Amino acid sequence: KIILLLILVASHAQAHTATWYGGQFHGKLTASGERYNQNAFTCASNKYKFGTRLKVINKANGKSVICRVNDRGGFGKYGTTLDLSKGAFKKIAPLSDGKVRVMIRRV
């Protein structure tokens, strides 16, 4: 029973890398058709469906943010799982960090 529980927990919270995007995309249409707001708590993901709410936890400091998937991107080729809005990223790390290791959970 314990092994099964560990497998289930591991499948719902895996280590990933997140970056952020902002300024040049602010006000432009996202892949979902809504306008990008760099201050909203949203993110781009090629794995999760539009509208999925994710809890993103910075592994280095434990800070977290809940964001909603509303965009896609070409960031996967750089080893990045999520591209957070500027507002969401600022909740978990200074923008100057640029890229952070995170845990991701659906909520």
Regions found by a protein language model. Give the residues of each.
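Sec-dependent N-terminal signal peptides
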Residues: 2-11
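Secreted/periplasmic proteins
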Residues: 13-107
